[in-house]
Amino acid sequence: MRKKFYRQAQKGICIATLSATVLTSIPTVSYAEAYAKGRAVMEEMQKLSLPTENAVTFNLADAALRQEKTFVDAYGEDFTTTVIEINIAKNGTYIIKGSNEINGAFVDTHIKVEKGVEANIIFDGAQIQNNQRYASGVDSCGNIYTNQLFPVLDIEGTANLYVEKDSCLTSPDMDYSYVIQVTGDMTLKEGNGRLTLMRGNCKEDSEEEKYGESILGRKEGENRRRGTVTLEGGDLAAYGGIEGLEKFTMTGGKAELSYGDSRCVYAEDIAILGGELSLTDDAEKEWVSYFLKGRNS
């Protein structure tokens, strides 16, 4: 009910295929041609104008990132589990690489950009799959509902995202989950790889995992601003709705947004000014509508 009510209150753009004039794009020259074989990855990043100076690198395989965290479930009982916590509390550049699969099991990962912080985050082949869920609350009818532990990426400040190498972030395979939660500002910048957001497993057929939310622009029960998402460059594939934003803007790059429900993006303001945007619906539906609406679209 809360999800349905929220959706009705939002503006949206629905399933369609929309191409806008590309204002800015990533250079098409191969970096393998520009650099001699064997050059360091950092040099390639610098060629892309990625902000790598004084960058802090987090390898998800690093045991120092793992810690025990306790949650309180709907029954008032403690639930303790091992998680990977990356808390970004200072302005700077951060590189995320590796996988959160440790000894054959996935360790749920939480990357948080604190309020008031501006961070450049470079995903360098990161593969993050969050699976855990717990009984987190009770609805007005007394029914217990489950939720994910946290989103993969939690943006309360400002996050500029770059993708050096194809990276995939996933949320648990459940009806109400989201990969990125942004109550600040998120901008996808240039890169040399694709960022994929989805529910479930990156190794599975993404066409079956396009329900739920890929990006959520609000936090329930908290009186705070809604987030903004801007696509300036790069390559984004998001399987699941982008919901609850104050503003969604696209000026460049490439984005493939797929959602099995009626609309791909819900935002108060939507501005498509450039880039290549593809919006697709559930292939099993026989109807396709073309709809772009926002308060200031």
Segments from the language model and where they lie:
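Bacterial Sec-dependent N-terminal signal peptides
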Residues: M1-I15
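Hydrophobic core
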Residues: T17-S25
